[in-house]
Amino acid sequence: MSDVARILKEARDQGRLTALDFAKEIFDDFIELHGDRNFRDDGAVIGGIGRLNGQAVTVVGIQKGKNLQDNLNRNFGQPHPEGYRKALRLMKQAEKFGRPVVTFINTAGAYPGVGAEERGQGEAIARNLMEMSDLKVPIIAIIIGEGGSGGALALAVADKVWMLENTIYSILSPEGFATILWKDGSRSEEAAELMKITSGELLNMGIVDKVIPERGYFTSEIIEAIKTAIVDELAELSQLSTEDLLEARYQRFRKY
């Protein structure tokens, strides 16, 4: 098995820590909030407020399940538009009260069902991209599994984008890439090599800003490393004026 195939397998592993795991382990007194105030709650997106070293932080994440029933409840981590609208509601609330935002991303992509399209999936994603680009508080986005397509990017327009070591971030799945390019989904491993989807490759290209090591570390050590990195980064970002924060975010994405 090639290195990229191993990483792809680990990124999709059902036993990986979820967004909710990180929210509860990293932040004190995490309180989950629900609903988009428009249609319904979406179990594929979690969000709420917690404290980090005494500072209030808004946490948003895309949640996969740990077993079949949980995955059915979470729609296998594929958000509907109401999930993205819930996320945006919480981020705008964070802006109102001056709370930084941390997002945890693990999704193969936004849900492509008929109902989701009828309720404006494309609009919901596009609005998140627009609003996050101008959100007047610090944002840190962390890929914790799969970072698939616009469904992942809708929570990743951030001042800093990080990845865990054994995760992926791509425009679409390797299977989808192979099907489109070669009409053969079985060539997914070959596609993954071409796509440059691993954390190391994306760090080298400047797409992500930090890779958090996983191999050889206990779960508790990984959680502590993420917590420390968030504390340090928020301390730096909080020193910037709103104008400088937004300009740096703008330039970060303009360079692509």
From Swiss-Prot:
Species this chain originates from: Streptococcus thermophilus (strain ATCC BAA-491 / LMD-9)
CoA carboxyltransferase C-terminal domain boundaries: 1-236
Biological processes annotated in GO: fatty acid biosynthetic process; malonyl-CoA biosynthetic process
Protein name: Acetyl-coenzyme A carboxylase carboxyl transferase subunit alpha
Principal place of residence: cytoplasm
Job of this protein: Component of the acetyl coenzyme A carboxylase (ACC) complex. First, biotin carboxylase catalyzes the carboxylation of biotin on its carrier protein (BCCP) and then the CO(2) group is transferred by the carboxyltransferase to acetyl-CoA to form malonyl-CoA.
Higher taxonomy: Bacteria, Bacillati, Bacillota, Bacilli, Lactobacillales
NCBIfam families listed in its UniProt record: accA, AccA_sub, PRK05724.1, PRK12319.1
Gene field: accA
Assembly, per entry: Acetyl-CoA carboxylase is a heterohexamer composed of biotin carboxyl carrier protein (AccB), biotin carboxylase (AccC) and two subunits each of ACCase subunit alpha (AccA) and ACCase subunit beta (AccD).
Superkingdom of origin organism: Bacteria
UniProt key word Signal: no
Keywords: ATP-binding, Cytoplasm, Fatty acid biosynthesis, Fatty acid metabolism, Lipid biosynthesis, Lipid metabolism, Nucleotide-binding, Transferase
Pfam families, alphabetized: ACCA
Subcellular location: Cytoplasm
